[in-house]
Swiss-Prot record:
The active site is at residue 37. GO terms for cellular component: cytosol. It is an enzyme of class 6 (ligase). Catalyzes the condensation of pantoate with beta-alanine in an ATP-dependent reaction via a pantoyl-adenylate intermediate. Its EC number is 6.3.2.1. The reaction proceeds by a bi uni uni bi ping pong mechanism. It comes from Escherichia coli O157:H7. It catalyses: (R)-pantoate + beta-alanine + ATP = (R)-pantothenate + AMP + diphosphate + H(+). It is found in: Cytoplasm. It holds the Pfam family Pantoate_ligase. This is Pantothenate synthetase.
Length: 283
């Protein structure tokens, strides 16, 4: 497994792979890898000849400096996991390598609408940072496919729109959420939970599933469903942050013509902001 830290070396390797006619898959990450990331890697391996995993804690997508400062950097352990998975290439650049003149004056990519709604409304600049780094990685790696987790539902929708709008010739693969046995979605942020909070955490998925059951049973008073869910979360020990029921295809409000809904939930548990989602057929 090759570990590359500079743009010139990465370009050199990508040129070689292109000349050899290899099909390349990219898995963009911020490191601190868990089994959910490994599921992305496995999906990439099944679909391509060569798998490139990027590990970069992107300062442009953090709206709070303290979150950036405390985000775990575990490069050595990450590379050991990826080597066991027989990943071909790890791209682990420094911030200086990606943003030589800092982030303030760096050219950015913004996806109107999707970047400022829902999660974007409470985290200003976050999705601009995501679309900027992902488009830069697409330009550098030139992958045939790229794999993203469905846990970050809005991010996946944003990437799909950016790829369509910008004409990237890249297949975007959404990989289903990987969960612990008790239902908690795997996330790097789970590491912020205390042992006691970890016991409470599966309650998020239980509330999510309860909303889904109501929708599937034909209930359509969304305001009431959301209010009850928020109350349930708070009673379980969470601080409900945002609960949305949206059209799964547009992320707009659910309408009479909506075929599928996505339930998006964000809640604080101690110092960890946990997010999860679930799709529901409305037909």
């Amino acid at each position: 497994m090759l570990i590359i830290e500079t743009l010139p070396l990465l370009r050199q390797q990508i040129r070689r792979l292109r000349m050899e006619g290899k099909r390349v898959a990219l898995v963009p990450t911020m490191g601190n890898l868990h089994d959910g990331h490994m599921k992305l890697v496995d999906e990439a391996k099944a679909r391509a000849d060569v798998v490139v995993v990027s590990i970069f804690v992107n300062p442009m997508q953090f709206d709070r400096p303290e979150d950036l400062a405390r985000y775990p950097r575990t490069l050595q352990e990450d590379c050991e996991k990826l080597n066991k998975r027989k990943v071909d290439l790890v791209f682990a650049p420094s911030v200086k390598e990606i943003y030589p003149n800092g982030t303030e004056t760096h050219t950015y990519v913004d996806v109107p609408g999707l970047s400022t709604m829902l999660e974007g409304a409470s985290r200003p600049g976050h999705f601009r940072g995501v679309s900027t780094i992902v488009s830069k990685l697409f330009n550098l790696v030139q992958p045939d496919i790229a794999c993203f987790g469905e846990k970050d539902f809005q991010q996946l929708a944003l990437i799909r729109k950016m790829v369509a709008d910008m004409g990237f010739d890249i297949e975007i693969v959404g990989v289903p959420i990987m969960r612990a046995k008790d239902g908690l979605a795997l996330s790097s942020r789970n590491g912020y939970l205390t042992a006691e909070q970890r016991k409470i955490a599966p309650g998020l998925y239980k509330v999510l599933s309860s909303i889904a059951d109501k929708l599937q049973a034909g209930e359509r008073d969304l305001d009431e469903i959301i209010a009850i869910a928020g109350q349930e979360l708070n009673e379980k020990g969470f601080r409900a942050d945002d609960i949305q029921i949206r059209d799964a295809d547009t992320l707009l409000e659910v309408s009479e013509t909506s075929k599928r809904a996505v339930i998006l939930v964000a809640a604080w548990l101690g110092d960890a902001r946990l997010i999860d989602n679930k799709m529901v057929e409305l037909a």
